Amino acid sequence: MKKDVLTLGGHEFSSRFILGSGKYNLNLIKAAVENAGAQMITLALRRANTSGGENILDFIPEGVTLLPNTSGARNAEEAVRIARLARAMNCGDFVKVEIIHDSKYLLPDNYETIKATEILAKEGFIVMPYMHADLNVARDLVNAGAACIMPLASPIGSNKGLATKEFIKILVDEIDLPIIVDAGIGRPSQACEAMEMGVAAVMANTAIATAGDIPAMAGAFKQAIEAGRAAYLSGLGRVLDKGASASSPLTGFLED
């Protein structure tokens, strides 16, 4: 049986759950990562303190792949600068390009994201661009050298779930790269539904960081993502447009 792995930039991951780290108490990160079974975690450089204070890198378990993001970047130039800084800090070649200059809704700037992706891909980064679900933009990101496509489900931190569901389905059908749902997933059930649709992975942060029991919620997401993936690979049962179909014979049971 073929091994089911997520492949990004030539690297293989058995976990399809990418954990965000932006809102955690540092002391809970290790437990969340372990319960999530996550092999990749996002990293905002402002939390990687190299001047002697608390450093998030000290709390991330060994062997977990770092995914530095360009949080705070307002244009391609700033995103490229942050990515280069992350590499200089030995955070590796993965980078999540996140470019936002809309401070109210925190929606990504797709066009600046394309520009940054092209520059960074040429420099050997494994670029994972965060974007608004748009097929034409996704195609441009593929051509720019992206390693995957990361459409938002709903606005960052909203926990509103799969508001862009129909557009994500289009990306799954039309784009050959892994589609990783990012931002807005608020419940394990929503993560499961995304995986059932055929996305390659799910990233979650706020839904876990704001839960009553953070490690337990991380574990719940892990199970939901695994269940959704298994359902997708199994082939979901058909849905009738109308009427019903008995699951047991309606004749030949009670006879005179």
Swiss-Prot record:
<dbReference type="Pfam" id="PF05690">
    <property type="entry name" value="ThiG"/>
</dbReference>
<dbReference type="GO" id="GO:0009229">
    <property type="term" value="P:thiamine diphosphate biosynthetic process"/>
</dbReference>
<keyword id="KW-0704">Schiff base</keyword>
<feature type="binding site">
    <location>
        <position position="157"/>
    </location>
    <ligand>
        <name>1-deoxy-D-xylulose 5-phosphate</name>
    </ligand>
</feature>
<protein>
    <recommendedName>
        <fullName>Thiazole synthase</fullName>
        <ecNumber>2.8.1.10</ecNumber>
    </recommendedName>
</protein>
<dbReference type="InterPro" id="IPR013785">
    <property type="entry name" value="Aldolase_TIM"/>
</dbReference>
<comment type="similarity">
    <text>Belongs to the ThiG family.</text>
</comment>
<keyword id="KW-0784">Thiamine biosynthesis</keyword>
<dbReference type="GO" id="GO:1990107">
    <property type="term" value="F:thiazole synthase activity"/>
</dbReference>
<feature type="binding site">
    <location>
        <begin position="183"/>
        <end position="184"/>
    </location>
    <ligand>
        <name>1-deoxy-D-xylulose 5-phosphate</name>
    </ligand>
</feature>
<dbReference type="InterPro" id="IPR008867">
    <property type="entry name" value="ThiG"/>
</dbReference>
<feature type="active site" description="Schiff-base intermediate with DXP">
    <location>
        <position position="96"/>
    </location>
</feature>
<comment type="subunit">
    <text>Homotetramer. Forms heterodimers with either ThiH or ThiS.</text>
</comment>
<keyword id="KW-0808">Transferase</keyword>
<dbReference type="GO" id="GO:0005737">
    <property type="term" value="C:cytoplasm"/>
</dbReference>
<keyword id="KW-0963">Cytoplasm</keyword>
<comment type="function">
    <text>Catalyzes the rearrangement of 1-deoxy-D-xylulose 5-phosphate (DXP) to produce the thiazole phosphate moiety of thiamine. Sulfur is provided by the thiocarboxylate moiety of the carrier protein ThiS. In vitro, sulfur can be provided by H(2)S.</text>
</comment>
<comment type="pathway">
    <text>Cofactor biosynthesis; thiamine diphosphate biosynthesis.</text>
</comment>
<feature type="binding site">
    <location>
        <begin position="205"/>
        <end position="206"/>
    </location>
    <ligand>
        <name>1-deoxy-D-xylulose 5-phosphate</name>
    </ligand>
</feature>
<dbReference type="InterPro" id="IPR033983">
    <property type="entry name" value="Thiazole_synthase_ThiG"/>
</dbReference>
